[in-house]
Amino acid sequence: MAIFHKKPKEREHPEQLTPWERFQRDAAENHRAAQKSHHSWSGKRLRIGDKLPKLKSQRRRLLFKRVVILMGCFLIGAGVAGYFISPLSHVQTVTVHGNDQLSVTQVKTATKINPGVALWSVIGHDQRTTKRAERAQPQIGKVTTKLVGLNSVRVTVKEIRIAGYLSTGQHYRRILENGLILKVTYSQPGGGSPIYANFKSGHRLATMIAQYAKLPSAVKHNISEIKFAPNKANPERVHLYMNDGNEVYATISTFASKMAYYPGIVAKMKTKGVINLEVGAYSYPFKNQNN
């Protein structure tokens, strides 16, 4: 006779479970929760792992960029240093332009621009070079420099024109059109510029030079001597001896404006004579001179 054991019915409510059944149920739930947490953490680790190659690639690019910058700075610094110690950074040849009264050697000496000097001390320092040149050679008014090729320098000077030579007895001193009287004395005056004689007043001489500077070049070159010759009627009278053989009487304060008529007056004269520009403008032959 078979004996059948009847399966006990599952309890429908938790409060009907025995302590052992409740323990087994809690253990099973804890196991399932642990497995779920493990799978979730593994997924996160996989996602972070996917990002690691990208981070490494970014770091490599950043490192490469820094290395390139450092190498670039080093190469630039080395190139600059190499240039400054190489012959390319020094003046190789010097050419001088614009000089008329001054020689090339005088300009080079005054500016101190000679082969061998550093280019960086010359190019871009025209104002400083001009001041240095003026102290050494007052006849230099302005200096400009230009780099030609790799290391050749073109020096252009603007001279202050010579207004003439001041007679000081047995010697002569050069006068510039800016009124400066140079200290150097000469036994003979230079050609192409007038001699200033009998000028005792510095103010009179300065005014005369300023008036002379306004004249056209053709008239300037025709004046041989300017002699201060005042009289009672005209304390500013000057007596000029011209290279063409004529003589002129004029007034210092109106000298430039009156001398502008000189070429036209001479063209109408039939013989050499005297031209008086003190009051009005008229001329007469030497035989009728009465001064």
Swiss-Prot record:
Record InterPro entries: Cell_div_FtsQ/DivIB_C, DivIB, FtsQ_DivIB, POTRA
Extracellular side: 88-291
TM regions (residue ranges): 67-87
Taxonomy, superkingdom: Bacteria
GO biological process: FtsZ-dependent cytokinesis
Keyword terms, alphabetized: Cell cycle, Cell division, Cell membrane, Membrane, Transmembrane, Transmembrane helix
Keyword Membrane: yes
PROSITE patterns: POTRA
Cellular compartments per GO CC: cell division site; plasma membrane
POTRA domain boundaries: 89-160
Family classification: Belongs to the FtsQ/DivIB family. DivIB subfamily.
Reported function: Cell division protein that may be involved in stabilizing or promoting the assembly of the division complex.
HAMAP family cross-referenced by the UniProt entry: DivIB
Protein name: Cell division protein DivIB
Species, as recorded: Lactiplantibacillus plantarum (strain ATCC BAA-793 / NCIMB 8826 / WCFS1) (Lactobacillus plantarum)
Name of the gene: divIB
